[in-house]
Amino acid sequence: MNSCIIVLRLLLSGPFVFAPAWSYNLDVRHVQNFSFPLAGRHFGYRVLQVGNGVVVGAPSEGNSMGNLYQCQPETGDCLPVTLSSNYTSKYLGMTLATDPTSDNLLACDPGLSRTCDQNIYLSGLCYLIHENLRGPVLQGHPGYQECIKGNVDLVFLFDGSMSLQQDEFEKIVDFMKDVMKKLSNSSYQFAAVQFSTYFRTEFTFLDYIRQKDPDALLAGVKHMRLLTNTFGAINYVAKEVFRPDLGARPDATKVLIIITDGEATDEHNIDAAKDIIRYIIGIGKNFKTKESQEALHQFASKPVEEFVKILDTFEKLKDLFTELQKKIYVIEGTSKQDLTSFNMELSSSGISADLSEGHGVVGAVGAKDWAGGFLDLKADLKSSTFVGNEPLTVESRAGYLGYTVTWLPSRGTMSLLATGAPRYQHVGRVLLFQQPKRGGPWSQIQEIDGIQIGSYFGGELCGVDVDRDGETELLLIAAPLYYGEQRGGRVFIYQKIQLEFQMVSELQGETGYPLGRFGAAIAALTDINGDELTDVAVGAPLEEQGAVYIFNGQQGGLSPRPSQRIEGTQMFSGIQWFGRSIHGVKDLGGDGLADVAVGAEGQVIVLSSRPVVDIITSVSFSPAEIPVHEVECSYSTSNQKKEGVNLTVCFQVKSLISTFQGHLVANLTYTLQLDGHRTRSRGLFPGGKHKLIGNTAVTPVKSCFVFWFHFPICIQDLISPINVSLSYSLWEEEGTPRDPRALDRDIPPILKPSPHLETKEIPFEKNCGEDKNCEADLKLAFSDMRSKILRLTPSASLSVRLTLRNTAEDAYWVQVTLSFPQGLSFRKVEILKPHSHVPVGCEELPEEAVVHSRALSCNVSSPIFGEDSMVDIQVMFNTLQKGSWGDFIELQANVSCNNEDSSLLEDNSATTSIPVMYPINVLTKDQENSTLYISFTPKSPKIHHVKHIYQVRIQPSNYDNMPPLEALVRVPRVHSEGLITHKWSIQMEPPVNCSPRNLESPSDEAESCSFGTEFRCPIDFRQEILVQVNGMVELRGTIKASSMLSLCSSLAISFNSSKHFHLYGRNASMAQVVMKVDLVYEKEMLYLYVLSGIGGLLLLFLIFIALYKVGFFKRNLKEKMEANVDASSEIPGEDAGQPELEKECKDPGCLEPLQKTDEDGSGGD
C-alpha cells in the first residue's frame, strides 16, 4: 500500500498558448536550467527557492536513493545536499516546504519502511534544515509506530485507590478479563498488578502460562482502597514483574497498560520503565481539566497523543478494546472478524508538509485506515500530535486526509490550516482546522466537498494573501483530474467571507487537453508585475510537454484569465512534465526582479520576471488652433505656403517595480495617426500620409520629437477638432539566453497591460468675428406646394421641397426635423441645384420618439451652414397601402442649430397641407354575346329584339371612405323621320331601380352614335355586376334604297371626383356597344334573266360557225395518231446512230400548220 500512495502522488504531478505564451511578464527567451543527470528523471519533482539558490527534490527511481540538490544561479551548478542519517531515504525530496519567516527548509521522505514481525511499517523521515543548508539539521520520524507484533509481555497496572467505587473497580477487572480472552490465541503474555499505597502482584507471567483462564487468575482480586502512588507502581512493575524468573521473555516487547481514576499522590521518576511501551487510561471525573490530563502524559510513551486515553465513564472501558485492536493488522478494504485496522502503521507521514513561523505540519494519509490526518510537529521534530477526522466515520475511511496541507496565515489569535482528502467518497474533501497560536487542541471548523467523482479535489492546496497584509483572502483548491469542456483539471477559488471560505470562481486551462492535469501544482508567487498584489502560478504538466499559467492578483481576488501561458517547448525541445512543481518568492539574480523556478522531468527551469514599465507621454501643438484660412477652398488657388502645425511628442519610461536595480532602456515603436477614426483624414504628414511609424530608445530621462503636418483643401468639417492619436509598444531583438551573472546588462522591460494610447485634439479657429461668438438666424419654408395632390395609387410617391436660409453668421450642426403622417415612408433626400454640393443626410427617428406620426432628422451642411447660405431640400416619400388617411395630410418642419438665439426662432418652423385623393378601381367591358348586327329587307320580319351586355368589375379598396357609385347607361336616340323605331330597357344583376333621363339632341344630326336617354342606376361595391340593355328595333316604312345605320349604347361608372379618382383612368370605367342596322332594297329581275339566256345561246352559235369555217371539224386526226403509234413501235439496230432531227419532227399533226405558214410566208425552199 505504501508504494501505491507514493506512485499516485508522483503520477499526479508527473507525466505528468491560449496559443503560444503571452509575454506578460516572465521572460521566456532568457532562461536558466539546472540538471543533475545522476539524480534521474524525478529531479525537479519539487523545487524551492531557499537563500540565493534553488533546492531541488529528486525522489528515487528503482532501487536508488532520493536526495536533495542545491542549485546556484550564479554558477549554474547543482550539488547534492549532505544529510547525516542512518536511514536510507528512497523518497527524500518528494516533500519540501519552506518557512517564509525564517527561510528554513523542511524536507520529508514519506516512504520510510521497516519490518515488524514480517509486516511492513511505513512512516516518515523529516529534516529541518537551516536556510544556508549548512547549519544544524534536526531529524524526526513523524508517525513512527512502535513495533508491538511478535512476542508481547503485557502488564495491567490498575488503580485500587479509595476513590474507586466497588462497581467501578469491578468494571476495570472485567475490562482486563475481556482483553485477555480476545488475545488468548496470540503471542501475548499477561500479568496484573494492583496499586494503591502499596503494590500487589495479582498474577505473574508464570501464572498466566500455567493457567490462561482470566476468570481464575483474577478471582481473588480484592480492592485495596488506599492512595494512588503511580510513580512507585510503574517502577515496581519495571523491576519486580518484568523478570525472566517470573516468566518475562527477553525478546518480547514490554507493554504496560495503566488504568487509574486520579492523579498520582507520590512523586518520582520512571526511568526504569523507559524501554516499556506505556499506555495510560484515565477514567472518571478527575480528568476534566487540561492540567489533570497533562499530568498523565508523564507516564505515557511518546507521542503521548497515541498513548493516553481519557474516558469520562467506566462504562466506556468495555468498548476500549476496539482501539487496542488497531495494533493488529488487517488489509485495507477488508473486514475480518476479530481483526483490527491500521492506526499509524502505514501512515506515510510526510507525504505533504508546510512550515510557518517555525511551526511544522506533515500529512499522514495512511493513518486510521487511510482516513488520514496530519501531524502537528513539535519544534524538535521528536514528537507530534495527530489530528484527523473527528469523529472518525466509515465514510472518511480511505479518504487520504493529509494528502496536502497548507497554512493559511492570519493576523488573529488562531492558526488556520487546510488539508485535503482527495479520495474522500471518491469526490474529495478539504477540511479546515484551527488552533490557538499559543498552543492547544485543534478543532475542525469547515468542510468543503468536491463535486466530480475521480477529480482528486483537494489534490493541491494554496493559500493566497492577495494584498500581502498578513491575512489569507483566498484558498485555491485544485482538482487536477477534473474533466469538462475538453479541459483536464480545474482550480476552484474560495474566498474568506466572515468566518468561512466560500467559492467565488474557478480557474481552468486551455481547451483541447482533457488530460492536462491543470492544477497539479499551484504556487503563490511574490508580486512579479509591480502592482503590489500577489500573483499565482498554476502548472499543467500534461498539456503537451507541460505548461505554466500566470494569474495576476487583482483587488479582491485573481484575474479569471491568465496573463501568460508558458509552454515548456518554448524554451527547450524535448522537455517533459514542465510545471510539475513551481516556486517563486525570491530574487535569485540580484537585479531586484522576482524569479520563478519550475520543475520538469530531470531538470529545473528558472524564469526571470521582466521589469514592468509605464511610458509617460505628452503631446502638444504649435499653433494651438488650426488656421481656418488654410483649409478654405479659396486657399488652393493662391500661391501661399502652407503653415501647418508643429506636433511635439515626448517620451519617458518609468519602472513600476520599485525593487528593480538595473539600467532601464525601453525600445519603443510608436505610431502617430491623424483622424484615425475617419475614413478620410483632415490632416496629412509630409508625403500625404496620415500615419507615421517610428522607433526610439526611451530612458527615464524625458526625450522629445517634433513633427509637422498640414491639411487638404476644402475641408467640410471645421467644427470637430482633428484627433491626433499616439500608440506605442515595445520591441526587442532575438537574443541569446541572458547570463544571470551579467548584472550590468540591460534587461528588456515589458509594458503594463493597459491601453498604450494617448489621444489629443487640436481645434479649428472659429470665424465668428471679433467676439468669437457665432450667432445664426435660420429661416425655413415649404415651397412649390400649390399644385401638390397626393393620389393614393399603389406606387404613389410624394415629393416636398423645403427652402432653408441662414441670414446671419455661421450655423453649427444644423438639423432639420420633418414630421409626416404614418402612411408615408421616407425614400430619399437630395439637394436641388445649384446647391447640390451642400451635404445633407436624413434618418428616420424611432417610432417611440413621436406620437401618431413619424419624423425625419436631417443634418444639413454638417457641421457648418455658412452665413448668407440658402439651400433647397427635396424629400421624397413612398406611400403605405394600409395607411390611415384623411382629406389632407399635414407636414411640419423645424430647423435648429447649436448657436441660434431663442429670440430668432419664429421663422424656424413651417407647415403645409396636401389634399389626398383615393383610388377607385373599376373595369367595364362589353360582352361578346351582345347583338352587333341586324338587317331589314322587304321580305324579312319588321321587328328585331336585340341586347347589349356589359360586365362591371370592382376591385376591393384598401380604404374605408369609398363614395357611392352610379352606372350611367345611355341608349340610342329615335329619329322621327327615320324608317326604324326602337325601344330600350335596362336589366341589371343584381337588380336595381334605374331612373331614365332624356338627353338633349346633338347639334350634329349626322353623328354616327346619338344617345337619347340616359339611365342612372345606383350600384354597390360588389366584385362583379352585369348590365343588359334590351331593345326592340322595328321597320316602319318601305325601303326605297339600301343603307346602313349604327345604334349605340354605352356604360360609364360615375362617382364624386373631388376626393376620388379612377385608378386606371376614366376610360377604364367606360364601355360602348355599336350595333349595325342594314336596310336592304330588292328589285324584279325575271325579264333580265330571260334576255341574258337568249344572248348566251346566240354567242355560242357564232363560235361554232367560226370553227367550221377554219376546217376544225375536217382533220384526219385519228389516222395521224395511229401512224405515229406504228412508227414509235419500231426497234432501231445496235449500229444505228443518233436519230436525225428532221426524222423526230415528222408528225404531220404537229408540223403541218407550221409548214403551211412557211409556205404561205416564203413559198418553200
UniProtKB/Swiss-Prot annotation:
<dbReference type="GO" id="GO:0002291">
    <property type="term" value="P:T cell activation via T cell receptor contact with antigen bound to MHC molecule on antigen presenting cell"/>
</dbReference>
<keyword id="KW-0130">Cell adhesion</keyword>
<feature type="repeat" description="FG-GAP 4">
    <location>
        <begin position="387"/>
        <end position="442"/>
    </location>
</feature>
<feature type="disulfide bond">
    <location>
        <begin position="71"/>
        <end position="78"/>
    </location>
</feature>
<keyword id="KW-0675">Receptor</keyword>
<dbReference type="GO" id="GO:0009897">
    <property type="term" value="C:external side of plasma membrane"/>
</dbReference>
<dbReference type="InterPro" id="IPR018184">
    <property type="entry name" value="Integrin_alpha_C_CS"/>
</dbReference>
<feature type="glycosylation site" description="N-linked (GlcNAc...) asparagine">
    <location>
        <position position="1056"/>
    </location>
</feature>
<dbReference type="InterPro" id="IPR013519">
    <property type="entry name" value="Int_alpha_beta-p"/>
</dbReference>
<dbReference type="Pfam" id="PF01839">
    <property type="entry name" value="FG-GAP"/>
</dbReference>
<feature type="glycosylation site" description="N-linked (GlcNAc...) asparagine">
    <location>
        <position position="33"/>
    </location>
</feature>
<feature type="disulfide bond">
    <location>
        <begin position="650"/>
        <end position="704"/>
    </location>
</feature>
<feature type="glycosylation site" description="N-linked (GlcNAc...) asparagine">
    <location>
        <position position="1067"/>
    </location>
</feature>
<dbReference type="GO" id="GO:0006909">
    <property type="term" value="P:phagocytosis"/>
</dbReference>
<feature type="binding site">
    <location>
        <position position="473"/>
    </location>
    <ligand>
        <name>Ca(2+) 1</name>
    </ligand>
</feature>
<keyword id="KW-1003">Cell membrane</keyword>
<keyword id="KW-0460">Magnesium</keyword>
<comment type="subunit">
    <text>Heterodimer of an alpha and a beta subunit. The ITGAL alpha subunit associates with the ITGB2 beta subunit. Interacts with THBD. Interacts with CD226.</text>
</comment>
<dbReference type="GO" id="GO:0007229">
    <property type="term" value="P:integrin-mediated signaling pathway"/>
</dbReference>
<dbReference type="GO" id="GO:0007160">
    <property type="term" value="P:cell-matrix adhesion"/>
</dbReference>
<feature type="disulfide bond">
    <location>
        <begin position="768"/>
        <end position="774"/>
    </location>
</feature>
<dbReference type="Pfam" id="PF20805">
    <property type="entry name" value="Integrin_A_Ig_2"/>
</dbReference>
<feature type="repeat" description="FG-GAP 7">
    <location>
        <begin position="564"/>
        <end position="624"/>
    </location>
</feature>
<feature type="topological domain" description="Cytoplasmic">
    <location>
        <begin position="1106"/>
        <end position="1165"/>
    </location>
</feature>
<dbReference type="InterPro" id="IPR000413">
    <property type="entry name" value="Integrin_alpha"/>
</dbReference>
<dbReference type="InterPro" id="IPR028994">
    <property type="entry name" value="Integrin_alpha_N"/>
</dbReference>
<comment type="similarity">
    <text>Belongs to the integrin alpha chain family.</text>
</comment>
<feature type="binding site">
    <location>
        <position position="527"/>
    </location>
    <ligand>
        <name>Ca(2+) 2</name>
    </ligand>
</feature>
<feature type="signal peptide">
    <location>
        <begin position="1"/>
        <end position="23"/>
    </location>
</feature>
<keyword id="KW-1133">Transmembrane helix</keyword>
<keyword id="KW-0812">Transmembrane</keyword>
<keyword id="KW-0597">Phosphoprotein</keyword>
<feature type="binding site">
    <location>
        <position position="467"/>
    </location>
    <ligand>
        <name>Ca(2+) 1</name>
    </ligand>
</feature>
<keyword id="KW-0106">Calcium</keyword>
<comment type="function">
    <text>Integrin ITGAL/ITGB2 is a receptor for ICAM1, ICAM2, ICAM3 and ICAM4. Integrin ITGAL/ITGB2 is a receptor for F11R. Integrin ITGAL/ITGB2 is a receptor for the secreted form of ubiquitin-like protein ISG15; the interaction is mediated by ITGAL. Involved in a variety of immune phenomena including leukocyte-endothelial cell interaction, cytotoxic T-cell mediated killing, and antibody dependent killing by granulocytes and monocytes. Contributes to natural killer cell cytotoxicity. Involved in leukocyte adhesion and transmigration of leukocytes including T-cells and neutrophils.</text>
</comment>
<dbReference type="GO" id="GO:0030369">
    <property type="term" value="F:ICAM-3 receptor activity"/>
</dbReference>
<feature type="compositionally biased region" description="Basic and acidic residues">
    <location>
        <begin position="1140"/>
        <end position="1159"/>
    </location>
</feature>
<protein>
    <recommendedName>
        <fullName>Integrin alpha-L</fullName>
    </recommendedName>
</protein>
<keyword id="KW-0472">Membrane</keyword>
<feature type="repeat" description="FG-GAP 3">
    <location>
        <begin position="335"/>
        <end position="386"/>
    </location>
</feature>
<keyword id="KW-0581">Phagocytosis</keyword>
<feature type="binding site">
    <location>
        <position position="529"/>
    </location>
    <ligand>
        <name>Ca(2+) 2</name>
    </ligand>
</feature>
